């Protein structure tokens, strides 16, 4: 039983004894005492005024007096401010609470059981015509952290990815490679496969624009105005016509085109795997659009037969969503080709066949809000049980400060380049501050990797996902303030203290003995540690990993003040020294768990 539960039981007894009334536990409202008042927990007295038939101040005084007299092991002091009773919890209660946190190897984490709900989380969703970029970084980090948070709340979690591996954009890279590649491979070029294919996507665009420019001038010379000439040039570009023909052949299962498609996509997947590994994200199941788009068509036709959808004169299939306050939505074009919505329905069908899904969460940018509103309704109409409860984990754009780390094209920042730059910056900053002194080259490189990637991940994850954000590389690697490196350094500092204690032969017992006089700072730290359980729960119910990130920062900020104000290893009172070591060890444990949920490593030394 935790402190709040014990206190609630004592307050119920107080009301019964003082006012002769039985009250349910939910009527007892306890909250953290505001910093300007003395105490740890505050009871809201107003619900009991009808029972006491007295004013709020007097009622608070009576309940406080009863608790101090009849539960001195729980309440050591109290003060009343209007209708609020501020209660100071006895020191031994805090030690007991610390012991319970220490006894739990994974405090705050709820394990899934056989009967736990299954949550599927889709994130990443790359195209196979280019490398992952800065936008994917935010998506991957959010998806991975959210999966960890949902698992920590006792859910079975399946992490899934849908790869956009078909369509005209893929054919553009394929065609450019055939025309200009001279058989170049990742091995011959020394490039990652995704970067190599990305180069050919850019090459297609360059040649296509030059072709359109030339044709536009030709059509203008023949008497068309600029707008008409450009439209005709785009429609008649030989390069684009070839790309469309290649797509037609792909859809007709042309063996040569399919073999080329497979070869080039395999290069890209090998590149993606390296990026994902460096980023520390993984998937339990990967779906490919080339396998799902036909399934979607089938499901739409099934919905048409059942009268959920209707067909227009041009043979296209639509959903009428006006009853739901939306408009009419295209599901199949007149020529039978699918749209994104069809593909999402197909992917949903396959997933539902593969897993007994209770909740489906899509981690996709906020520009797709309407799309997922529609998808939820369509899936529900088609009989997918989780359709109505579908969650679109919508997030805002992420940008870089102007002029920072632009790629050669000057528009997109590759994830690989960004991570490499972060590790390099971490190495320079750490070396300047002496944080790599005395380490081998291998150890220093590993610290730079942990700090660089930790800085990137934390800076992105501390921001509420719904907000647009600017990622500032230099600011993120600051060892002071609300940053990953500040939290990592505090963890390493704690491990250093614990190593020194072990070298001095000091052993932290499994149970810290009672009878110590604790400071308000020490009690406050234990209270913060205990809060971790509710922080994890809130992050899960709100789908908000930033709650955990900011909790970790608040915790290490408090610990650093404690570290500054109190002696640990130099404390003369042995019992107090051991208590402070135990407190430090448990702060380290919770910091490591919290950062782990965000996908961030913490170094044992720095």
Curated annotation (Swiss-Prot):
Name the gene behind this protein.
argS
The UniProt annotation puts motif 'HIGH' region at: 126-136
Q: Does the keyword Glycosyltransferase apply?
A: no
What name has this protein been given in UniProt?
Arginine--tRNA ligase
Any one Gene Ontology molecular-function term assigned to this protein's record: ATP binding
Question: What Gene3D superfamilies does its record include?
Answer: Arginyl tRNA synthetase N-terminal domain, HUPs, Isoleucyl-tRNA Synthetase, Domain 1
State which Enzyme Commission number(s) the record gives.
Answer: 6.1.1.19
Subunit structure comment from the entry: Monomer.
